[in-house]
From Swiss-Prot:
Keyword Repeat found: no
PANTHER family: VALINE--TRNA LIGASE, CHLOROPLASTIC_MITOCHONDRIAL 2, VALYL-TRNA SYNTHETASES
Catalysed reactions, semicolon-separated: tRNA(Val) + L-valine + ATP = L-valyl-tRNA(Val) + AMP + diphosphate
Single GO MF annotation: ATP binding
Cellular compartments per GO CC: cytosol
Source taxonomy: Bacteria, Pseudomonadati, Pseudomonadota, Alphaproteobacteria, Rickettsiales
First-level EC class: ligase
Localization in the cell: Cytoplasm
Nucleotide-binding found in the keyword field: yes
Short name of any one Pfam family annotated for the protein: Anticodon_1
Protein known as: Valine--tRNA ligase
Keyword field: Aminoacyl-tRNA synthetase, ATP-binding, Cytoplasm, Ligase, Nucleotide-binding, Protein biosynthesis
Binding site for ATP: 539
Length: 812
């Protein structure tokens, strides 16, 4: 018989098993298995944008719990890993890391540097994901900037062009002057900022003074109208008249519109092109002229003697206010706090510019998308409202153009041929992937076309993350249609709650437009990982936890244990106490396994190979039967929780059973029988050892999705050379049940609890002998009474039924 190792070294063992799993391809996807037997995951491709943190471990391990469970349940698993390595986040990382600016160098040179940086950063991710034992199939890896991904992303674009769901137009868009690019509505965040409400004097064309209030006086040269509410009696006499703007002396119409708030400012509002969404509405509704004074770099260009040209927005605002004061045109200023729309990544206040852009039709599909949100299985269910709220709030079509460099190019040129100037030329599907700066449309020379210099929003590509893995977009656009049909729609999208409005929404939109379907059946939402004081982790606070240090201190299984203790969808604080509990659990699993191991040589070979159902009749002891029934109940409960994506509940049930039912009670109660040193009860001994054998094996399997290394190590020592994590290794005891009265075993436990408390109060050892136990309220069977005598060290037990409740008198 082999020896049980003296101790468990997590550092050595975790590395050992990670290597073995890769070598033996335990996690390999089998493309020959039927679709119905395959479970497909749309893994979040991490953004290559900076330092790895504990949040990556937190969210990705929670997905892995479900994946490992599904594999053990017999599913053929398609579990890829991708890297979202194109777009603005990566560009910002490269610019910061290399201390360069994209606009100061050749485009090709900057792209080359980006490619070098992402290759290095992605290797760090691979290393971490292997260390935390993500059971991905690395042969399925993809990058969003790879040629294949660019091809599929461009297919998505062309398919939507063909379906008339994409258009290009010169219209107002949100512009980030810091990053120099257009943004979509989902790329912005509202920030509370202090400012001034400036009360400025205008005049009517007849010279009568008018006072308007504005927070953006620098937009005076872009003023195209002044509005009042049609029901506002103060201004009804202005109908049909014009106003003269101060400083710039431009004549603009005075118009009525119900969008004006009578209680804000003076009730007179200047409309500029453009200060906000309302300006756009008025510009379109009233067919107003366009005056563009803000450049793409966020400076003023109005070519006026006020000399604010070339100034940044805030500088121009300060200067205009000074001039207005000097000319006594500024009546007063009020301190205010208002909401400003800012770029989510750069933090810069956004401007509204009119620039030709590509848009995906979104507003016209809002009702359909709300129906899709309802069709999807949400885990947890309360997260659905976040998507519904976002869909209801959408007021712009999705702008997918970005004026950047490291991204997927639009497969588009613009004709310069005589007679078709400006005609949009699309690449043929056979040309993809293409770069319009290097390639040409069929039948055109370089001199006859102008390439589209923009790249796609990174979400335009990551929104087809399922299709990047399935290698197809639709019936007409596919690299491998058979593969796509087999894998799409997928089974699961795991992701964080803060990107429901972006990644989840855009992916649902694309699948709806491409194939009139959902992209997946289930969506599993994770929360945030917070600092121990429940504040958000940030570099500025110095509270960001680095995974490498925690892995070195605790190991992967303990970190995964901490992650498994957080409820699905909930924000969870890092906890040193939970980490210590995880370490304690690993140690207890090891010691419990060591105890059961010493008895296994007493088992017959065929009984070790048989299932619990097959050897059911050989478990003869009443308490052993009760234990197996409790185990069967646990398996059913834990399985149900995992099938419903409630991994934390499954972990809690299993851990509580292990500590309380198995270690604290069963091991202690059956210990004397298991050893049977006096050979009094060979049948009872064999029954207990069989029970130990199968309960420990089952518990290892229930813990396996959460703590893969320690369970694999113990499983190999105790049971098999085959991996515990292979397909179909889960337990199914649906047909197993012993017809016994559970009251007997439960009564034994109640009596034992009373005795333990008595000994603890008397500061006695748990093994301290007892002369007599007088028990009323229950009469135990001879088997249970013998187990009770052994575990309490009682010489004699007397039972009588004179009480309704169990009472115990202890005589030392």
């Amino acid at each position: 018989m082999k020896e049980f190792p003296k101790n468990y070294n997590f550092t050595e063992n975790e590395k050992k098993w990670q290597q073995i799993w890769q070598e033996k391809q335990i996690y390999a996807y089998n493309p020959n298995v039927a679709k119905e037997e395959t479970y497909v995951i749309d893994t979040p491709p991490p953004t290559v944008s900076g330092q790895l943190h504990i949040g990556h471990v937190y969210s990705y391990t929670q997905t892995d719990f479900i994946v490992r469970f599904q594999r053990m349940m017999g599913k053929n698993i398609f579990y890829p890993m991708g890297f979202d390595d194109n777009g603005l986040p990566t560009e910002r990382l490269v610019e910061k890391q290399k201390q360069i600016k994209a606009y100061n160098m050749e485009r090709s040179e900057f792209i080359k540097i980006c490619e070098e940086v992402v290759e290095s950063e992605e290797e760090k991710f691979r290393s971490l994901f292997n260390q935390i034992a993500l059971s991905v199939d690395w042969s399925l890896e993809y990058q969003t900037i790879s040629p294949l991904s660019r091809k599929i992303s461009q297919m998505s674009f062309l398919d939507l062009v063909q379906k008339e769901e994409i258009y290009r137009t010169n219209q107002p868009i949100l512009w980030d002057p810091v990053d120099g690019t257009a943004l979509a509505q989902a790329d912005i965040e509202d920030k509370e900022q202090t400012s001034f409400m400036n009360y400025i004097t205008f005049k009517t064309e007849q010279g009568d003074p008018l006072t308007i209030a504005t927070t953006r006086p620098e937009l005076l040269p872009a003023c195209v109208a002044v509005f009042y509410h049609p029901d506002d009696g103060r201004y009804k006499h202005l109908a049909g008249k014009s106003a003269i703007t101060p400083l710039f002396n431009e004549q603009v119409p005075l118009l009525a519109d119900p969008l004006v708030r009578q209680d804000k400012g003076t009730g007179l509002v200047m409309c500029c092109t453009f200060g906000d969404q309302t300006d756009i509405t008025w510009w379109k509704t009233h067919n107003l002229p366009l005056k563009t004074i803000i450049t793409k770099k966020g400076t003023i260009d109005c070519q006026h003697e006020t000399s604010i040209d070339g100034l940044k927005i805030k500088e121009a605002r300060t200067k205009i206010i000074a001039i207005l004061k000097e000319q006594e045109l500024l009546i007063k200023q009020e301190d205010i706090t208002h909401t400003v729309k800012c770029a989510e990544r750069s933090g810069a206040p956004l401007e509204i510019l009119t620039v030709p852009q590509w848009f995906v039709k979104t507003i016209s599909h809002k009702e359909e998308l709300l129906k899709r949100a309802n069709e999807l299985n949400w885990h947890p269910k309360n997260m659905k409202i976040r998507l519904e709220n976002w869909i209801n709030a959408i007021s712009w079509d999705w702008c997918i153009s970005r004026q950047r460099y490291f991204g997927v190019p639009f497969p588009v040129w613009y004709s310069k041929r005589v007679g078709e100037e400006g005609k949009i030329l699309y690449a043929d599907i056979t040309q993809l992937p293409i770069d319009p700066l290097k390639d040409l449309p069929m039948g055109y020379s370089k001199e006859e076309v102008e390439p589209d210099y923009d790249v796609m929003d990174t979400w335009a590509t990551s929104s087809v993350s399922p299709q990047l893995s399935t290698h197809g977009i639709s019936d007409d656009f596919a690299v491998n249609k058979d593969r796509h049909d087999k894998l799409f729609p997928m089974d699961l999208r795991p992701q964080a709650h803060e990107i429901i409005r972006t990644w989840a929404f855009y992916t649902i939109l694309k699948a709806h437009l491409h194939q009139n379907t959902l992209p997946w059946k289930n969506i599993m939402i994770s929360g945030w990982c917070l600092a121990e004081d429940r504040s958000k982790m940030s570099k500025s606070k110095g509270n960001v936890l680095v995974p490498e240090k925690l892995l070195e201190q605790y190991g992967s299984d303990v970190i995964r244990y901490w992650s498994a203790n957080s409820k699905l969808g909930a924000d969870t604080a890092y906890s040193e106490d939970v980490m210590k509990n995880g370490k304690r659990l690993v140690n207890k699993l090891w010691s419990a396994a060591k105890f059961v191991f010493i008895h296994f040589d007493k088992l017959k070979g065929e009984d070790k190979k048989a299932s619990l159902l097959d050897i059911k009749e050989k478990i003869t002891n009443e308490f052993d039967k009760w234990m197996v029934n409790k185990l069967v109940e646990l398996v059913k409960l834990a399985t149900n929780e995992l099938q419903n994506y409630e991994y934390a509940n499954a972990m809690h049930l299993t851990e509580k059973f292990f500590w309380v039912v198995f270690c604290d009670n069963y091991l202690e109660i059956s210990k004397t029988r298991s050893y049977d040193e006096e050979h009094k009860n060979p049948q009872g001994q064999y029954s207990s050892i069989l029970t130990l054998y199968h309960v420990m094996q089952t518990l290892l399997k229930l813990f396996a999705p959460f703590m893969p290394h320690i369970t694999e190590e113990l499983y190999q020592i105790l049971y098999s050379e085959n991996s515990i994590h292979v397909k179909g290794s889960w337990v199914n005891y649906s047909d197993l049940n012993y017809e016994i009265n559970a009251k007997g075993a439960e009564g034994l436990l109640e009596i034992l609890d009373i005795v333990r408390k008595f000994k603890a109060e008397k500061n006695l050892s748990i093994k301290a002998p007892i002369k007599l136990l007088e028990v009323s309220g229950i009469v135990l069977s001879a088997e249970l009474a013998e187990d009770l005598k052994n575990v309490t060290s009682a010489d004699e037990i007397q039972f009588e039924m004179k009480d309704d409740k169990i009472k115990v008198n202890i005589i030392l």
